[in-house]
Amino acid sequence: MLQINSRLAVIDGWLVDTVKRKPINFRSPEVRLLLPNDDDYKKLSQQNLVDWTRLKKDSNSVLVGVKSMELFKHIKLVLREFFLLEDGRIILKRIRSKSRYKVVKKLTCKCCRLYLPKWGTVYIHPMLKDKEKPLAGVCEFSLDVNPDREYPLIEINVSHQYIIIEGFLLYLNERRLYRWNDNNLRGQVGLTKWAHLRKTYNPVSLDILYSLNSNFYFVKDDLLFQLLGKRVFVKFCKVMENGKCGKAPLWYRVKRTTTAKATHIAYAISNSTAPDSFKSKNNDYRFIVREKPIVENTISNLDYSDIKKQQFTEAEVVKRKISADISQIENVHTQFNSQKEKNNIRVNKVSSEILDQISKFPVSRVTLLLMSAGQDKNYIELVEELARRLEKICIEKTTQSLEEIRDTFQANPEMQARFDKEYYQSIEEYKITLELIKEDLLITLIKQMENMWAAEKKFSTEEEYVSPRFLVADGFLIDLAEEKPINPKDPRLLTLLKDHQRAMIDQMNLVKWNDFKKYQDPIPLKAKTLFKFCKQIKKKFLRGADFKLHTLPTEANLKYEPERMTVLCSCVPILLDDQTVQYLYDDSIIPEFEATSSYATKQSKCGRKMSLQMEPDLLFQEAIRRMRHLTAYDVLRRNYIAAFEELYMGNCND
């Protein structure tokens, strides 16, 4: 270190104001004011000083490492949070929204801010040389989240999602913590499932925190702080009995502080959100504290083992009391609970790696599956947009049908008010059902659409004319005169073909017609030439859950046809030796969907006459039955597939 005068010094090429403890740009007009003596100024100009503009030119990041431990002993450092982007740049956390690159890592370090005219702001931080030890109180940290760790994801009626981390129940939709012993939550979950989840996961950490005399609770898992987002900087302080000094502190408390003095990060919870019995006039906040310090403070005389022991001892007592109170509530409510719980509660496992990719909750199970499979972000966004459009189509059609039923009671306000209770409940229920259908069907439908360009059965694609009349293509022998495929073993070929032509056919790998007898349902093919030269007929089939075609039911089962999906498909018939007919269809074309079955038509006609023919009570019962039918899983599922086909064929102008 070279002392220029009583205030300025040069440390490893940096000009430092030792009074204000900050670096000074040599090109700044401030320097001349601080060095009125010409000899001092000349002495300074002879030094090999760092050119600040090179800091920005040599780095695309705002965080620049400097290998000078001596420098950082004489300047002030503050704690700042940064993001490491996938393109290698490091940016300040508050400008994250302006970047289109994915965040790879979140980090925080103590650094010094430098302002460069025309270049902007950079932050310098200490970079260790070989065999150097870090400065006391100066270190870099980042939230250390284990990407493989899994957490219980609780879904309530599909649209409300919670996660449990170290006993804290986090409502992901709002990124807000909830007490487990909360009346609203208990009513939403249902008493039986509420009790089961408590016994399985015991998410009572927030209840414990509110019951502690201490104002802090340690957490090891960094994912909680990552999901909660906004963090504060804190330090621990000692509290003496009755405010008097004693030989030893009786208690430790957490206090918010500046980034320069902070030892830990924490999430602050206002006491205003606590139950009245837990509120304290002297303490406005309680803190969930990250157990791992952000700095190793060698100056502090606090013993962290005593702090942890304080929390553990107090928390164990409180935990037993809370568990006993909740068990008593469960026993009391169970005796008087006779209502059937209708809420749809599901618990799944989700990894922190997947959670880190989600910007907004709730997130559908379809999206979670695609993320787990490592699908591209753009592909997932396309699937989400498709799901949104399908849901919109289904909701519009179903709501329109329900409105028609509701209009039946326009002339009777009393009956309409009675019906509306069931009506609005059905709307909520069918929206949940649609979400379940999306989970069951959407990925299957998309895969089926993608497979429409792949052959289900791989035949030879070579095209070769055996004679002017017969063509071999797609594994079939095609009779161009009759425009149909023909059995290679057909006796007529003895007179229609010469010996060398029949020998040519025998050497080819053609479809064996006896194999067709093994199939009861139509056979999907990827055979462009076959469908180009052969006559096709329109025939009705049933489409199953596997998105494949099946033969129509027999006369005995015909009554079940309304509950199945009927489609009209172009196909090539094949007459087999036993006089049975098999059908080949092109699976790259989606068949026409018969949106209105005879059953639906009949119901529509009955609906128009219903108000004229029925007594009010019978009319109400019939309306409820029709509404239940329209919102049933099977009907909504059929509508969902129909909407998918409409979008695929381009017939929907959504």
Swiss-Prot record:
Subcellular location: Nucleus; Chromosome, Centromere
Record-given protein name: Regulatory protein SIR1
Region (ORC interacting region (OIR)): 449-587
Recorded superkingdom: Eukaryota
Keywords, in A-Z order: Centromere, Chromosome, Nucleus, Repressor, Transcription, Transcription regulation
Function noted in UniProt: Involved in the establishment, but not the maintenance, of heterochromatic silencing at the cryptic mating-type loci HMR and HML. Is recruited by interacting with the ORC1 subunit of the origin recognition complex (ORC), which binds to HML-I or HMR-E silencers, DNA elements that direct the formation of silent chromatin at the mating-type loci. Establishes transcriptional silencing by recruiting the three other SIR proteins, SIR2, SIR3, and SIR4, that function directly in silenced chromatin and establish repression. Also found in centromeric chromatin.
UniProt xrefs under InterPro entries: ORC1-binding_dom, Sir1_ORC-binding
Gene Ontology cellular component list: chromosome, centromeric region; nucleus
Chain residue ranges for the region called Sufficient for interaction with SIR4: 322-654
Assembly, per entry: Interacts (via OIR domain) with ORC1 (via BAH domain). Interacts with SIR4. Interacts with CAC1.
